[in-house]
Each structure stands twice: as structure tokens, then as C-alpha cells.
From Swiss-Prot:
DUMP binds at R21, R126, R127, R166, S167, V168, D169, N177, H207, L208, Y209. It is found in: Cytoplasm. Its main location: cytoplasm. The active site is at C146 (nucleophile). This is Thymidylate synthase.
Length: 264
């Protein structure tokens, strides 16, 4: 995943200093894209160790339509704790929008179910898109969506995915996002009897927090290792029936973890 390291270099060399909501401050660039061929391996960062358990459980949590951290905590995942209220609630964030988008007429739309059925029915559609940016509900969310939309594309029997991200915590968040959307693409491809194609990231405000700069420089001293492979052990009847134990990451040999504080 040398392209990720090149993005770190880009921000360190070309980023402008900006104040931000968290008060930490960032080095920021605008409008960047990364591409990953999913045929070449599962894009799990190797220049530092990632917590695979958190990535998988978070995606399963989104797909459940859940917006309370209880499920995550019960499974040893704490990545959303800082934003939850005293009851563990986060408001109508990703899971709510993916599974039960509220329209102006009061009806809800299960976008995940819809997009899978549409891929099967009309794979050439240019409307294979899911959005989490529900303007009418943004003020109810503890954290408005950073990765706010994703689109699928089918060609030559392969499913590709591109996701849009308005705000990109490049050191901590982006490696998780890459792996999460890669996993989602594999799952939906399996459900639609397709192979996987390309994964594309498109970011708006792409930044490094100022308290992540030394960690990014350390990471740049490390040589990327071969990508691992994802094994999905079974094909459930629906996208919503996958369990943590269905996934295995094979031959993951990363460099050691690099600790960095989360900007809340």
C-alpha cells in the first residue's frame, strides 16, 4: 500500500495549517484519490498493525442499523465511545441512514437491501449509490458522517466500489476506512455472485492532526510488506447474516502498532 505512504508524504510536504473543530489543528490538503486493486490482496495497512477486530465489528454494527455502542463494547470494540452519550447513543449516524433513511414523507428506506437487489437486477445502473448524508438529521448526530456516500460499479463480472469522504483523519481513520470498504465490497460481491474489482477512495479535506505528525514520519521509514488475503468462510442467505467468525485475514504480517491520540 505504497500509495497510502505517498499520501502521508503529500500532506507533510504540501499541507496547509488549519484550525479545526477539535482544537488540535491539522496539516490539510484538498481533493485526493487512492485506488486499490482488490485482486492483488486485501488492503490492510502493513506499515503499522491495525486492530482487525474493530474494523469487522464496526462494519457488522453499521449493517445491523445499530447506533448504540453497546454491541461494540460487548465485543471488545471501543472506537466510538468518545462520541456516545451517557446511554451509549450516537444519534442517527451511519447504521440508521444505511438501513432506515427517513424521507420527507415519513417512510424509511433500507438502502443496503435496495442497492444489493439493484446490483442483481440492473448491474449497469449508474444509481448504485448509498448515502449517509441526511441533511434533515445532521443536527441529531453526535458526529456527522465523515465517509458520507459510496457507489458501486459492475464490469466484466467484477464489483468495484468508490466512497466519498468529506473529512479524512489520514493517520488513524483512513486505514480503517480502506479496510472497511474493502470488506463491504467483498461481502456484497459474494451476495451478488460477482468477483471483486477496484476500491477507490475520494477525499475532500484530507489531513494529519498536528499530534500525529511524528507518527506519520515514523511510518514513512517502514517498508510495506505483502498484502494479506481475506477469506470468507461461508455465504449467508443475506448481507445481514454475516458473523465475525465468517472472516479470516490470512498472512497478515504488519510492522508494530503506532499509538496516536484520537481528536474528539
Amino acid at each position: 500500500m505504497r500509495q497510502y505512504l505517498q499520501l502521508l508524504e503529500d500532506i507533510l510536504e504540501n499541507g496547509v495549517e488549519k484550525d479545526d473543530r477539535t482544537g488540535v489543528g491539522t496539516l490539510s490538503v484538498f481533493g485526493r484519490q487512492l485506488r486499490f486493486n482488490l485482486q492483488e490482496g486485501f488492503p490492510l495497512l502493513t506499515t503499522k498493525k491495525l486492530h482487525i477486530r474493530s474494523i469487522i465489528y464496526e462494519l457488522l454494527w453499521f449493517l445491523k442499523g445499530d447506533t448504540n455502542v453497546r454491541y461494540l463494547q460487548e465485543n471488545g470494540v471501543t472506537i466510538w465511545d468518545e462520541w456516545a452519550d451517557e446511554n451509549g447513543d450516537l444519534g442517527p449516524i451511519y447504521g440508521a441512514q444505511w438501513r432506515s433513511w427517513k424521507g420527507a414523507d415519513g417512510k424509511t428506506v433500507d438502502q443496503i437491501s435496495w442497492v444489493i437487489e439493484e446490483i442483481k437486477r440492473n448491474p449497469n445502473s449508474r444509481r448504485l449509490l448509498v448515502s449517509a448524508w441526511n441533511v434533515a438529521e445532521l443536527d441529531k448526530m453526535k458526529l456527522p458522517p465523515c465517509h458520507y456516500a459510496f457507489q458501486f460499479y459492475v464490469a466484466d463480472g467484477k464489483l468495484s466500489c468508490m466512497w466519498q469522504q468529506r473529512s479524512v483523519d489520514t493517520f488513524l481513520g483512513l486505514p480503517f476506512n480502506i479496510a472497511s470498504y474493502a470488506l463491504l465490497t467483498h461481502m456484497i460481491a459474494q451476495q451478488c455472485d460477482l468477483d471483486v474489482g477496484e476500491l477507490i477512495f475520494s477525499g475532500g479535506d484530507v489531513h494529519l492532526y498536528k499530534n500525529h505528525l511524528e507518527q506519520a514520519k515514523l511510518q514513512l521509514t517502514r517498508e510495506p510488506r505483502p498484502l494479506p488475503k481475506l477469506v470468507i468462510k461461508r455465504k449467508p442467505a443475506s448481507i445481514f447474516e454475516y458473523e465475525f467468525e465468517d472472516f479470516e485475514i490470512v498472512d497478515y504480517d504488519p510492522h508494530p502498532h503506532i499509538k496516536a491520540p484520537v481528536a474528539v
